[in-house]
Amino acid sequence: MQYHVFATDFDGTLSHDGVVSSETIEALKRLADSGRKIVLVTGREMYSLKNTFPMIDLFHWIVAENGGVIFDTSSGNEIVLSDPPPTIFVDELVRRGVKGISVGKCVVATWTPFENIVLDSIRDLGLELTVVFNKGAVMVLPPDINKATGLQRVLLEMGLSVHNTVGVGDAENDHAFLKVCEFSAATANALPSLKASVDLVLKKDHGAGVVELIDRLLADDLQSYRTQRNNALVIGTSDDGPVLLHTFGDPMLICGASGSGKSTLANKIADVLTESAYQFCLVDPEGDFESFPGAIVLGGPNAAPQLDELMHALEQPGSNVVACLTGISIPDRPEFFLRLLGSLNQLRARTGRPHWLILDEAHHLMPVDWQPPAELLPEDWFNVVLITVNPDSLPLMVLNRVSIVTIVGSDANETLQAFGSATKKVVPLLPPPVLTTGEVWQWNLIDSVTPIRYNAMKSTREHTRHRRKYAEGQLAPEKSFYFRGPNGNLNLRAQNLILFCQIAEGIDDETWLYHLRRNDFACWFRDIINDENLAAEAELAAMDADLTATLSKSQIVAAIQRNYILLSSSRISVPGAM
């Protein structure tokens, strides 16, 4: 379920001339029975609302006085969000003959045609106040108070997000709160300016329009209107225009060879989610996202992330969380992910958050023989990004839930064919030329027959591969370096650069020079560590026939120490160094 909160205006929306129909009341009860929270967002003061509509327990929270006061109906707790109106201002309105003045805990209200006197009084007194119109009503508030700020404070109190909120209104003062809602609607009697700014204009007016919206929400969580919303996020550009990431979308698979741009695209997705305040949880087996700006990073090479700490961090709607698994051995990662996935499913069922789940190196979490309990992997697994090298490294039950296949790298056709072979799906042949740096193929299995080729937008944040991963992390066996020697008598595995240096210190000269002269070190540094400079250093050492084993070890290990080990907490000795 995407929408957990229903926010509605009162006068002119829920009610008609202050009266809420029995049909509207029944619809609100049905909505509450679905587990959703209902928030009333009104310009009225609490006493006025209670006198007009005593059934306030239909709502979980009330935003009153146009955002100045919030009220928890279950506890009766009222929170005033600003200072009271200046007495000098109220006195001046009375002195100038303004009629129908109502003074609340934050708001001063009157009616037209006194708006000009109100504006003149604010100017003449030199006050910083905001005038808000609600059809015939004229409301004066502190400059930082409106229906949007009140709604956002209520959502914070409930631990929920505007991105899981549907809003409906009819008048000028509804613009602010409808703008922050993920989905906005206007009743048929709404002002033209409001109708022009919302996602859906209802066919019916007042309470009947609210009932119409509730019925549609209960029918399919408004997913039939997904393509009509204006809040999709741009992640690239094609010849046909921008390429969009729908904020409530189908599972996406990003695949391609190492170094082909998977992490760059994933970083851009995390980037745009952050910029638009969509919460994500990124599971990072290899430490590629340890330094993502603004995210809470839990776990690392020396400590596994604790599940309770992860979930506590995610309870805050504004917190993005990276779960770094470099401190968990590769065989133990699927079990950890099973426990994490169960907790994430529960949080999503309760709040709709985290909005997105990004799984880097997904084959570490869900290997091909992975068999989770059926309830942990729902058929409608939404807002998930899976990142891997080869599609066939993931279990079929996961691949069958993928709706969008995104491919990077020069071997895109082979990668897409591998997806087809694994899923028994007929996949298209990608036309030439091969992809260049920054280009992406995307195939939508549901909506598009022909894949689209686009340029992925670069991240506005600098994302660097965290070097501690290679210094201290646990590389997979197939990515580790093996000292075997000229006769294959050894099989010493270095799954990170610290171990590489430690083994190098104790290895015999013949074995060291054997791998050096064959450029085995250079290939590992370039293809696995993704460090061209370190690879070049090893190649230069290999080309110098007069360089002894001791000196070449000293040079290469010193280069590793300069660029990697100093970033970690571990120490190593450098052969030949004092």
Where are these regions (language model features)?
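Conserved H-loop
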Residues: G43-R44, P285, V389-P391, S410
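Terminal, compositionally biased segments used for targeting/anchoring and flexible tails
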Residues: P431-M578
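Conserved ATP-driven motor cores of ASCE-family P-loop NTPases powering translocation/secretion/packaging/pilus
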Residues: N390-I446
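P-loop NTPase catalytic phosphate-binding loop
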Residues: R229-W356, P367-L377, F382-V385, D392-S393, ...
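Mg2+-dependent phosphoryl-transfer enzymes with acidic/Ser/Thr/Gly-rich catalytic loops
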Residues: M1-Y3, S21, L141, A148-R229
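Conserved acidic, metal-coordinating active-site core of Asp-based
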Residues: P86-C181, N189
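Short, structured coil segments at secondary-structure junctions
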Residues: M55-L58, E65-N66, L125, V180-C181, ...
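Active-site phosphate-binding/coordination module
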Residues: D17-V103
